[in-house]
Amino acid sequence: MILTTTNTIEGHTITAYKGIVVGEAIMGANIVRDFFASVTDVIGGRSGAYEDKLQDARTEAMAEIEERAAALGANAVVGIDLDYEVTGDSMLMVSVSGTAVTIT
Protein backbone atom coordinates (compact mmCIF):
# COMPACT_ATOMS: atom_id res chain seq x y z
CA MET A 1 0.00 0.00 0.00
CA ILE A 2 1.39 3.38 -1.02
CA LEU A 3 0.57 6.25 1.36
CA THR A 4 1.40 9.76 0.19
CA THR A 5 0.60 13.39 0.90
CA THR A 6 0.63 14.17 -2.83
CA ASN A 7 -2.46 13.93 -5.05
CA THR A 8 -0.71 11.78 -7.64
CA ILE A 9 1.88 9.02 -7.54
CA GLU A 10 4.68 9.34 -10.07
CA GLY A 11 4.80 6.38 -12.43
CA HIS A 12 1.28 5.24 -11.52
CA THR A 13 -2.18 6.00 -12.85
CA ILE A 14 -5.18 6.32 -10.56
CA THR A 15 -7.85 4.03 -12.01
CA ALA A 16 -10.53 4.29 -9.30
CA TYR A 17 -11.38 6.53 -6.38
CA LYS A 18 -12.69 4.42 -3.50
CA GLY A 19 -13.54 7.13 -0.98
CA ILE A 20 -12.21 9.16 1.91
CA VAL A 21 -10.51 7.27 4.71
CA VAL A 22 -9.89 8.65 8.19
CA GLY A 23 -7.86 7.40 11.12
CA GLU A 24 -7.64 8.85 14.61
CA ALA A 25 -5.55 8.07 17.63
CA ILE A 26 -5.87 9.63 21.05
CA MET A 27 -3.07 9.05 23.50
CA GLY A 28 -2.87 10.02 27.14
CA ALA A 29 0.29 11.06 28.93
CA ASN A 30 0.90 10.18 32.55
CA ILE A 31 1.69 12.52 35.44
CA VAL A 32 5.31 11.38 35.88
CA ARG A 33 6.05 11.88 32.20
CA ASP A 34 4.32 15.29 32.31
CA PHE A 35 6.53 16.32 35.22
CA PHE A 36 9.76 15.30 33.49
CA ALA A 37 8.62 16.88 30.23
CA SER A 38 8.04 20.17 32.05
CA VAL A 39 11.54 19.95 33.57
CA THR A 40 12.93 19.42 30.08
CA ASP A 41 10.98 22.44 28.86
CA VAL A 42 12.37 24.60 31.67
CA ILE A 43 16.01 23.66 31.10
CA GLY A 44 15.66 23.47 27.34
CA GLY A 45 15.85 20.59 24.95
CA ARG A 46 13.45 18.11 23.48
CA SER A 47 10.96 16.01 25.36
CA GLY A 48 11.62 12.45 24.27
CA ALA A 49 8.61 11.13 26.18
CA TYR A 50 6.20 13.32 24.23
CA GLU A 51 8.01 12.70 20.95
CA ASP A 52 7.58 8.95 21.50
CA LYS A 53 3.87 9.39 22.27
CA LEU A 54 3.43 11.54 19.18
CA GLN A 55 5.14 8.91 17.01
CA ASP A 56 2.95 6.16 18.50
CA ALA A 57 -0.23 8.13 17.80
CA ARG A 58 0.84 8.97 14.25
CA THR A 59 1.73 5.32 13.53
CA GLU A 60 -1.62 4.13 14.89
CA ALA A 61 -3.62 6.66 12.86
CA MET A 62 -1.71 5.83 9.66
CA ALA A 63 -2.29 2.11 10.23
CA GLU A 64 -6.03 2.82 10.56
CA ILE A 65 -6.28 4.55 7.18
CA GLU A 66 -4.25 1.79 5.57
CA GLU A 67 -6.64 -0.86 6.96
CA ARG A 68 -9.72 1.14 5.93
CA ALA A 69 -8.36 1.71 2.43
CA ALA A 70 -7.62 -2.00 2.02
CA ALA A 71 -11.17 -2.81 3.14
CA LEU A 72 -12.42 -0.61 0.28
CA GLY A 73 -10.25 -2.50 -2.21
CA ALA A 74 -7.71 0.31 -2.60
CA ASN A 75 -3.98 -0.16 -3.00
CA ALA A 76 -2.96 3.44 -2.22
CA VAL A 77 -4.03 6.52 -0.28
CA VAL A 78 -3.32 9.95 -1.77
CA GLY A 79 -3.70 13.49 -0.45
CA ILE A 80 -2.96 12.48 3.13
CA ASP A 81 -3.37 15.25 5.70
CA LEU A 82 -2.15 14.89 9.29
CA ASP A 83 -3.56 17.04 12.08
CA TYR A 84 -2.36 17.22 15.67
CA GLU A 85 -4.25 18.55 18.66
CA VAL A 86 -3.58 18.61 22.37
CA THR A 87 -6.81 18.29 24.28
CA GLY A 88 -7.47 18.77 27.97
CA ASP A 89 -6.27 16.25 30.53
CA SER A 90 -2.95 15.66 28.75
CA MET A 91 -4.50 13.95 25.76
CA LEU A 92 -2.86 14.06 22.34
CA MET A 93 -5.01 13.50 19.26
CA VAL A 94 -3.67 12.72 15.81
CA SER A 95 -6.11 12.55 12.92
CA VAL A 96 -5.18 11.46 9.42
CA SER A 97 -7.34 11.64 6.31
CA GLY A 98 -6.82 10.86 2.66
CA THR A 99 -8.43 9.46 -0.46
CA ALA A 100 -8.31 5.71 -1.00
CA VAL A 101 -7.55 4.88 -4.64
CA THR A 102 -6.66 2.02 -6.92
CA ILE A 103 -3.52 2.56 -8.97
CA THR A 104 -1.77 0.68 -11.75
From Swiss-Prot:
InterPro entries from the UniProt entry: UPF0145_dom_sf (IPR035439), UPF0145_YbjQ-like (IPR002765)
Natural source organism: Roseobacter denitrificans (strain ATCC 33942 / OCh 114) (Erythrobacter sp. (strain OCh 114))
Record's protein name: UPF0145 protein RD1_2695
Pfam family, one: YbjQ_1
Similarity comment: Belongs to the UPF0145 family.
Matching PANTHER family: UPF0145 PROTEIN YBJQ
SUPFAM superfamilies, alphabetized: YbjQ-like
